[in-house]
Amino acid sequence: MEYTTPPCDLNAVRMYRLNRVRAELEKRDLSGIILYDQLNTRYACDATNMQIWCSHNEARYLYVPTEGPVVLFDFGGKDILCEGLPTVDEIRPPINFFYMVAGVEYANRAHEWAADIDGIMGTHNRWNKRIAIDRMSPLGVQELERLGYQILDGFEVMESAREIKSDGEIQLMKKSVEVCEQAIGMMREALVPGITENALWAELHRGNIAGGGEWIETRLLASGPRTNPWFRESSMRPIEKGDMVSFDTDLVGPYGYCCDMSRSWICDAEPNDEQKRLYAEAYHQIQDNKVLLKPGITFREVTDSLRPMADEFVPGRYGVAMHGVGLCDEFPAVYYPQDWDKHGNDGVMKEGMVMCVEALIGSQGGREAVKLEEQVLITADGIEQLTSYPLETEWL
């Protein structure tokens, strides 16, 4: 981010991340990886260019070889957005074959694209025609396979690389948390009867952008009866006195790191007994579950040790009990016992992983729900909590 003083050595973070990617490629005996996903591209080289637009238009891509020069095929074909980056060795104009720009020539453009990739890979000593791709049009995959390439899942590579954060990454994440919590403070000040959900949600956006942040992934703010069931998006509903207001930030802040925390408040009133009851259970879910995290514990062991949830709250439980986070929500996802057989996948918690611990508490058919979430770093001794915006402990 230009015109800022970073809290750490950005080039050290950049090289750490690139080396993590290359280590995962090495483990899988891959020649390299082609990245179209904008957050994977950000992780591997830290070059940004219209990230949201390029997330739904395959207009820029990155080739990271296991050995050899990293090539960024950037929209516009210029280097103004990656000057001085130690992670990018060459800039080229992209060969785009998405329909908006290629029209009826998309098949021919895909053929040209594959020939170009083949030419680049053919210059590398490690050329074995095993390559990973994170996301792209099936036509591009077909063209590479026609040239004899074996295509592997790029998300396995990238999620594995992104799993362990460096000290520098944690410093950048703490900056994102700082900006997010300042913006939450702006929301709290703006919360008065009559303000719409959207106007309140806009305060989070305003604080994030003004503080150097980038975007917000979702629209998860709801009030009163719109909180239960969860996942209704922010609306033009005026918030009323005494309403529960619940929100989930999903905020991509400064330097591209995510602050994913949730809070629930009452608008201009003291909570009633039912609101206190819901809040207390959500609070204890967070407190009891976050301390389970430590290096070496398996995902299944975490699932089996989660705080039991009363039957009335089970139907409205959140989709996961906790999940990883970095530039966005990341691997792993840890599920509730009720969901393990269908969705569970095992693994091991490691030092350096950052996890978000979730709680969503609302009775089936009840008026409101409480959403709480904290972001924590797994350390050698347990956890360091990264989020610190106060909870409503006086309601307990």
Where are these regions (language model features)?
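Active-site neighborhoods and metal-handling regions in enzymes and metal-associated proteins
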Residues: M1-L396
